[in-house]
């Protein structure tokens, strides 16, 4: 017997949960978007779909892993991160501003330093240079300038005439003691390393024509470090101060560095002689400044066959010398390159022989120092010992200055040639 639609609806309502009665908007999950066939219009019992729909959404939301705290706490956390980011941005902006201020300050300091250097140079070449330099040094005493080389070295303006820095040395007669014909030699300050311990500062002096000298109290000599004036001294630093360059310089081999290092490690003349016999004819190259110099190892035994061997012993005040190698095409003079033989004596001192005069000139205290300083001391136009011009016999020929710092403008040379004679 067929059931009426009302009975069918009642049976369905008794067996199916109330919140899952199918309708157009309440679709079971297995339909996947496909709606079930609708009931006849005569069925009046329908439940609102939002009950089961809400429960299914609640069940699906229960699988999400929410962090501890409510949604408002999450919003507050995001606001805190934004505030932290803003604080970091403000810190970066403050640092950038401080860097810009520091750069502006450095730029201003550099500009003032350049102006002071230029003023010092102008005072050193005036007609009354001594008086102008004294006034300037007393006015800016204590001012510090940074040197380009070595790193960490500074020049400090200082009135050494008042502090009596030289002690036993007569400051007022320096030009007569060390130089040839300069009219004045005035101390203007000192150079020293930052936070140096056990190293006294080196006095800096300016002579006629603006030339800059450094006084070495160890060997009691003056070293010409800049012929171009005070500006060149600040720009080049102490590169032309041979003792410091021999101590702090570096060796750069181009080719055959193993051969050059073997010579650097040799401790005495016997080891050098054996090395020369072993490496005879070997070639290596190294750099002296911007020049790459080619060096050929010689047979040490040929030293004693050279007619100038006896003169080399006298000129260098040595008991024995050994000719170890020859350096090709050395640019020691303008528009001229020379092949210079290298000698080493029993104490390790290195000398270079001029190929035309056959005279030996002191170069360095050892082969390591020679590869660092190169031919800076060759023909000795940079180092001036006490009384080297007034009493040249007091200095060994290999260490003696060979020319006046004024070079072609030497007053003694011009007087000797009769250039001052009246016509």
From Swiss-Prot:
GO cellular component: viral tegument
InterPro entries registered for this protein in UniProt: US22-like
Keyword entries, A-Z: Virion, Virion tegument
A Pfam family that the UniProt record links to this protein: US22
Keyword Manganese listed: no
Composition skew (Polar residues), residue ranges: 1-12
Subcellular location(s) per record: Virion tegument
Spans annotated as Disordered: 1-46
Protein name listed in UniProt: Tegument protein UL43
Protein family per UniProt: Belongs to the herpesviridae US22 family.
Primary site of residence: virion
């Amino acid at each position: 017997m067929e059931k009426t639609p009302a009975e069918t609806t009642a049976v369905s309502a008794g067996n199916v949960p109330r919140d899952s009665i199918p309708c157009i908007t309440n679709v079971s999950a297995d339909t996947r978007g496909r709606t079930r066939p609708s009931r006849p219009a005569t069925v009046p019992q329908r439940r609102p779909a939002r009950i089961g729909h809400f429960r299914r959404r609640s069940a699906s939301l229960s699988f999400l892993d929410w962090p501890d705290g409510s949604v408002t706490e999450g919003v507050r956390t995001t606001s805190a991160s934004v505030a932290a980011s803003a604080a970091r941005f403000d810190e970066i902006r403050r640092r950038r501003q401080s860097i810009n201020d520091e750069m502006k300050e450095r730029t201003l300091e550099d500009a003032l330093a350049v102006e002071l250097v230029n003023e010092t140079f102008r005072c050193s070449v005036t007609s009354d240079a001594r008086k102008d330099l004294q006034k300037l040094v007393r006015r800016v005493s204590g001012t510090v300038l940074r040197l380009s080389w070595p790193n960490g070295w500074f020049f400090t303006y200082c009135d050494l005439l008042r502090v009596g820095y030289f002690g036993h040395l007569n400051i007022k007669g320096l030009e007569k003691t060390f130089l040839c014909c300069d009219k004045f030699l005035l101390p203007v300050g000192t150079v020293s390393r930052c936070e140096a311990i056990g190293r006294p500062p080196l006095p800096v002096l300016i002579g006629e024509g603006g030339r800059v000298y450094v006084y070495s109290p160890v060997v009691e000599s003056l070293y010409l470090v800049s012929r171009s004036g005070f500006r060149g001294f600040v720009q080049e630093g102490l590169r032309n101060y041979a003792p410091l360059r021999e101590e702090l310089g570096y060796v750069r081999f181009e080719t055959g560095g193993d051969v050059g290092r073997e010579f650097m490690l040799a401790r005495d003349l016997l080891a050098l002689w054996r090395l020369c016999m072993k490496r005879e004819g070997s070639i290596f190259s190294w750099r002296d400044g911007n020049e790459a110099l080619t060096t050929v190892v010689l047979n040490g035994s040929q030293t004693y066959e050279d007619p100038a061997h006896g003169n080399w012993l006298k000129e260098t005040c040595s008991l024995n010398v050994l000719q170890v190698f020859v350096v090709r095409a050395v640019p020691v003079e303008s528009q001229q390159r020379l092949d210079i033989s290298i000698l080493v004596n029993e104490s390790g001192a290195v000398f270079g022989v001029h190929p035309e005069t056959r005279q030996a000139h002191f170069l360095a205290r050892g082969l390591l120092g020679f590869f660092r300083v190169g031919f800076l001391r060759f023909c000795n136009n940079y180092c001036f010992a006490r009384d080297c011009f007034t009493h040249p016999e007091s200095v060994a020929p290999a260490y003696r200055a060979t020319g006046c710092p004024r070079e072609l403008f030497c007053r003694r040379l011009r007087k000797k040639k009769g250039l001052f004679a009246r016509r």
